[in-house]
């Protein structure tokens, strides 16, 4: 199977997982990126089964609206049963690296609100130790150099993501060469640097379920 076919399979599996638990009042949190886009397209086939969605990015909001799915501001929603999103990496404990698409801050906020965070990914994203994929850090623009120096002290090699401005008006530093053996601690350390909005480690609030697309079919993983 191609990578896109694996993504389509896990996207459909996520829809199949949440659909029996949705009703006309349900609002679904939706992530950002290529795998999340497949989820949106699959979810749209059942748009009368739920009320609407909260989007983690402007791009996701546009895709949802294009399918005729109502998009709500998070502040107007009292609870989210599910948040469905992809990942750049996951370990066996369902700690994630996210933010390749630069939407990490809003993704992390929506994930924090959701009762159940379902991560959808192809098998290549499951790794023994996080860090081969560069860790994105969203930074207030004027603090970029300061934050980069602090990230070097933590053992990383930060690279400014040229030409990228987040939906929040900030910039991204991608941190290479990190061996992330304690993701909860590192997430906290990086977030404590003045000028950091947040980083792409989802460890304080990891995924609850990982739907993993493999050649043998979709596997359901819970945190070890």
UniProtKB/Swiss-Prot annotation:
Substrate binds at residues 32-35, 85-88, 98-101, 125. It is an enzyme of class 5 (isomerase). Its EC number is 5.3.1.6. GO terms for biological process: D-ribose metabolic process; pentose-phosphate shunt, non-oxidative branch. One of its GO terms (cellular component) is cytosol. It catalyses: aldehydo-D-ribose 5-phosphate = D-ribulose 5-phosphate. Keywords: Isomerase. SUPFAM superfamilies: D-ribose-5-phosphate isomerase (RpiA), lid domain, NagB/RpiA/CoA transferase-like. One of its GO terms (molecular function) is ribose-5-phosphate isomerase activity. The active site is at 107 (proton acceptor). Pathway: Carbohydrate degradation; pentose phosphate pathway; D-ribose 5-phosphate from D-ribulose 5-phosphate (non-oxidative stage): step 1/1. Belongs to the ribose 5-phosphate isomerase family. Catalyzes the reversible conversion of ribose-5-phosphate to ribulose 5-phosphate. Homodimer. This is Ribose-5-phosphate isomerase A. It comes from Pseudomonas entomophila (strain L48).
């Amino acid at each position: 199977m191609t990578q896109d076919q694996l993504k389509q399979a896990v996207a459909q599996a996520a829809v199949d997982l949440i659909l029996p638990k949705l009703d006309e009042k349900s609002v679904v949190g939706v992530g950002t990126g290529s795998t999340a886009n497949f989820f949106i397209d699959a979810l749209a086939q059942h748009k009368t089964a739920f009320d609407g969605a909260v989007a983690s990015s402007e791009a996701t909001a546009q895709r949802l609206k294009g399918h005729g799915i109502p998009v709500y501001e998070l502040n107007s929603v009292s609870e989210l049963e599910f948040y469905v999103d992809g990942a750049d990496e996951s370990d066996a404990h369902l700690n994630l690296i996210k933010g390749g698409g630069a939407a990490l801050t809003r993704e992390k906020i929506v994930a924090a609100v959701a009762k159940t965070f379902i991560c959808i990914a192809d098998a290549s994203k499951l790794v023994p130790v996080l860090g081969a994929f560069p860790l994105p850090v969203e930074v207030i623009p004027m603090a970029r150099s300061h934050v980069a120096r602090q990230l070097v002290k933590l053992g990383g090699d930060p690279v400014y993501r040229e030409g990228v401005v987040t939906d929040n008006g900030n910039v991204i530093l991608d941190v290479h060469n990190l061996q992330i053996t304690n993701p909860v601690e590192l997430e906290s350390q990086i977030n404590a640097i003045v000028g950091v909005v947040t980083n792409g480690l989802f460890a304080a609030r990891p995924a609850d379920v990982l739907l993993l697309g493999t050649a043998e079919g979709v596997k359901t993983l819970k945190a070890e």
